[in-house]
Curated annotation (Swiss-Prot):
Belongs to the FBPase class 2 family. This is Fructose-1,6-bisphosphatase class 2. Its main location: cytoplasm. It comes from Haemophilus influenzae (strain ATCC 51907 / DSM 11121 / KW20 / Rd). The gene is glpX. It catalyses: beta-D-fructose 1,6-bisphosphate + H2O = beta-D-fructose 6-phosphate + phosphate. GO terms for biological process: fructose 1,6-bisphosphate metabolic process; gluconeogenesis; glycerol metabolic process. Keywords: Carbohydrate metabolism, Cytoplasm, Hydrolase, Manganese, Metal-binding. The lineage of its organism: Bacteria, Pseudomonadati, Pseudomonadota, Gammaproteobacteria, Pasteurellales. The keyword Manganese applies.
């Protein structure tokens, strides 16, 4: 992928983050997401490329912008597949909490798994334990494998888990095994990246989150040499088995079949992201473990962005200063 595109993509997440920031702490996650989506789409359409959204805000009948299959860019130049999550952590943005980021991953045509917006079970580790995880095995066995490979006891292992009611039993199991839990309210994209950074203090991420976030995170994981396995899970197997959830689950299974992917089947990293020629970029909205959040003084705002290129295995942290009046005028905010 053209190196110049990588910088362009970092500008996209910066704009989305700055748009979301206007709704920081205002209690309206939908308004924050809408602002980020509009800014991201506007910036994508300025780029000289022939791109398609493959992971986005939903199907064409569910989302007016950045829907799966939408064409973005000038329509000329390099063929690009794009996975976006304008805000990973909409609730955290609305409530002014930590770890909210804007995310984009890009690769060549057919780089990313095409999957519906549904639940996904994920197990993520860094490069130092690549090749030993197996979602077909019980969690305890995976934890013991990882600890052994790292030369650690289970009591020294740190597992990142989304703090959701569906994970209460998992968190209890990890504690009973003697391992440590780092529970986060949202934002498993940032958590996945953290596991794979060279100076990571987290050994693995495990849990059930969103499939779009899983595919976007897989780009960073592959670029950083980490490992991941995942499994698409119908809604009624995660939430209560109500008639409404069964109906949604049946639709999810049908959509998976149309895309050529099976539910409850283990997907390896190479199934999620098929090529190293990719870019992952994320910009902090609020302060977090991965990135600093936006800081504003009058008309000036500073952002921090991580930019990872798969082919060269480079990790860049970009700190930028933005004149907000000019930017918000362009974005019509």
């Amino acid at each position: 992928m053209n190196r110049a595109l990588a910088i362009e993509f970092s500008r996209v997440t910066e704009a989305a983050a700055l748009a979301a920031y206007t709704w920081l702490g205002r209690g309206d996650k939908n308004a924050a997401d809408d602002a980020a989506v509009k800014a991201m789409r506007y910036m994508l359409n300025l780029i000289h490329m022939d791109a398609e959204i493959v992971i986005g805000e939903g199907e064409i009948d569910e989302a007016p912008m950045l829907y799966v299959g939408e064409k973005v860019g000038s329509g000329l130049g390099e063929l690009v597949s794009i996975a976006v999550d304008p805000i990973d952590g909409t609730h955290m943005t609305a409530m002014g909490q930590s770890n909210a980021i804007s995310v984009l991953a890009a690769g060549g045509k057919n780089t990313f798994l095409k999957a519906p917006d549904m639940y996904m079970e994920k197990l993520v580790v860094g490069s130092n334990v690549k090749g030993i995880i197996d979602l077909n095995l019980p969690l305890e066995q995976n934890l013991r494998r990882i600890a052994s490979k790292l030369g650690k006891s289970l009591s020294d292992l740190t597992v990142m888990v989304l703090a959701k009611p569906r994970h209460d039993a998992v968190i209890k199991q990890i504690h009973n095994l003697g391992a440590k839990v780092l529970a986060i309210p949202d934002g498993d994209v940032a958590g996945s990246v953290l596991c794979c950074l060279p100076d990571a203090e987290v050994d693995l991420l495990y849990g059930i989150g969103g499939a779009p976030e899983g595919v976007a995170a897989a780009a960073a994981i592959r670029a950083l040499g980490g490992d991941m396995q995942a499994r698409l899970i119908p809604r009624n197997e995660v939430k209560s088995d109500t008639e409404e959830n069964k109906k949604i689950a049946a639709n999810e299974i049908q959509r998976c079949a149309a895309l050529g992917v099976k539910v409850n089947e283990v997907l390896k990293l190479e199934d999620l992201v098929r090529d190293d020629n990719l870019v992952f970029t994320a910009t902090g909205i609020t302060n977090g473990d991965l990135l600093k959040g936006i800081s504003r003084k009058g008309n000036l705002a500073s952002t921090e962005t991580i930019l990872i290129r798969g082919k060269s295995r480079t990790i860049r942290k970009i700190q930028s200063i933005h004149y907000l009046d000019d930017l918000y005028k362009i974005l019509n905010i």
